[in-house]
Amino acid sequence: MDENIYKDGGSEDTILPEDENPFRNELKTSPNIKTSLSGTVAELGSNQAKTNFFASEEMASDAEGLIHSGFVFSAASYAAMAAVNETFSVVIGAKIHFFAPTKIGENVEFDARAQFNDSAKREVRVIGKTRDIKVFEGTFQVVVLEDHVFKIYKANIQKQAAQRQRSRAKAEEEAQNS
């Protein structure tokens, strides 16, 4: 086998980051997401995004090529997050409907439109189509935060722990004084 790993494969073999995710510089949300599993942003504007999700073999849930609906949901959720396009935002709820199954090799185009731009809680309507046939529709609730959700969560846990500790100390003091 004569395989030269240093041989120049040519530019047609090279996938540049801007080809994989042309909006990577404008997109504030989900910088480390695997676009091969969640789709790529095709259009990005104020309170709206369009993404393309390609259903691959690794997403199949059976031998017939049915894509597990969790992958489709994840791709729709990513489209919603892209429409909001805030660094510290997280999906807190969704109401969704699947209208048709997705199979290996299909492309689902998601169109996401966000409302309530001035609010911390945004509502995003997402429609997914395959060959102009609606296969998905959902409304996502996205909350925009001041900091990363884990930092806020940690601060809240620490605050609750301090309150419990003060309550225990107060109860012990009252017990000793009785």
Model-derived regions, located:
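HotDog/MaoC-like acyl-thioester-processing domains
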Residues: 1-20, 88, 103-104, 115-178
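Short Pro/Gly-enriched beta-strand edge/turn motifs at strand-loop
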Residues: 19-27, 31-34, 107-109
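Catalytic strand-loop segment that frames the active site of acyl-thioester-processing enzymes
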Residues: 29-67
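A generic structural signal for short beta-strands and their flanking turns/coil linkers
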Residues: 35-37, 47-49, 90-94, 106-108, ...
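Short beta-strand micro-motifs enriched in acidic
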Residues: 42-44, 113-117
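A structural signal for short, well-ordered beta-strand segments
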Residues: 51, 94-98, 112, 126, ...
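Compact, glycine-rich, soluble single-domain proteins
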Residues: 63-73, 77, 81, 93
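Hydrophobic beta-strand-centered segment that forms part of the acyl-chain substrate-binding groove
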Residues: 78-109, 114
